Amino acid sequence: MQLNKIKLHSCTTFASAQSQITLDDDYNVPDYRPDIVKVLKEKGELHFDEVKAAAGAAWLKGRLVFRVLYRSDQENGKISCLKGEIPFQEKLNMDGVQEYDVIQASGEIEDLTIGVIHSRKISVRAVILLKTEEPQEKEDELCVGIEADDGCEKRYRNTNILQLLCMKRDQCRQKSEITLPSSKPNVQEILWKSLEIRNLDTKMGQDGVKLSGEVLISVLYQEEEETDRVQWYETVIPLDCGVECDAGTEADIIYKVKARPASMELEVKPDYDGEERVLVLELVMNLDIRVWKEQEISMLEDVYSLKKEIIPVCTGVTLHHISVKNESQCRLTEQMELAESQEKILQICSCEGTVHLESTELTEQGVRAEGILVTELLYITTDDQMPIGSAREIYPFEQLIEIPQQTARTERNKPEELEALERKNKLQTELDCRISQLSAVMLDQDHVEIKAVIGLDLLAFEQEQIDNITDMREEALDMEQLQKRPGLVGYIAKDGDSLWSIAKENHTTVEDILRDNHRTDEDLRRGEKILIVKKVELNSYES
């Protein structure tokens, strides 16, 4: 028999791995930099130079680039900075991966500690979590009918499928120039820079994927005057960039765009008068784009014939259904108190933050997320001998992102029924978090109020395992066994019975049972009595 099939495109993770590594190294202060007295701030970035697949493994080669802001022992230019890097290479075992496979790598700096060994040497210690995965686009064929059925009895089921329209990785770039206001002096050297994205939003439209939001730029620099004083400048510029995506022209699409900075560089260049007053921002964003569309289809679930024996050949297929796409916000208001040993605050320069998602748990109401917000302050002190100070604090947060279908299912089903349902239909969740807003307000010289809004984007899929007909075997009827069956049967319905299963078992059709019992509906209740008349096609004897 020739089957009618449609193609189902989906994305899956073929293999994944993660590994925690520790980098520990000493770094000598360059000769052109003054001696170190105290480390004020440190920052690290991961750069992957090579990601290579091998048989059953992935090789990562990259660098930890670190920056340090510190106090020096000089009378003029008390604040200085340095930049260095530590290379690393790591092998992650990934079952099933072959050479030339495309591997995606990401990393997270879980801890970065930089200490002073002596005035010309520092120790750098970092704990890094490396992750690799191999995403693949999968294609299945779903059976939706038979071309020439020859009078077969067929049962269909209506279902929604999630059709993958696009899966791609891309980059978008933005270059902006900012001229210092006239009240600010020229730049001799940038000592510290903070570049953070706020209120990030992604939209899918006719022109593709558009990113919007804000880039918060904070710069600590040394002015060109003879005093070598330190200046601070802060501004916000709009983020507006995007990439093309053909799937954006489809109607009723569902999309997920994961955007994260690949690199953010800030340099200074001369203006038209030759003065160092123009800041140049070059921003590169990595985009992980997936686009789906829900489609309602009628799948062929079962088939039999009164003329011959038909044996469907089935294989298991996983269907995905969108359960919820939810954007939630967690608001934090905390108070930071400086230690007694720290310098008092005169003015806050910048407030930087990073958010880490530590655990997610699927509950009866939705997904419970727990994580931490790491907040770092850079401020001007009341002590002219030590003009710049810093403070750091960690705040935990917890948020419940509701899944409406999950709540309704809990209220509708008994616990044992819910457990059975969850075994059959598993919920797959993807949760991303980011800082939407972060601010620091000085209360007094020792206390700062921290306010933050953490964005949590949840995409939940309901997974359903089904049997999909891939082929059919045809055999002649066993007429001897068929003749031994009674021609007339009285049947009392049991739990789980359906007219389809009864008709197939007793060699008749659902329509004949309805007609013989003067019924119009196919719903059976336990204890109902029905009359079954065996039906034998003449062609069966002739064959």
Protein language model features and the residues they cover:
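Interfacial loop/beta elements and low-complexity acidic/Ser/Thr-rich segments
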Residues: M1-K484
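Intrinsically disordered, low-complexity Ser/Thr-rich linker and spacer segments
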Residues: E475-L488, K534-S543
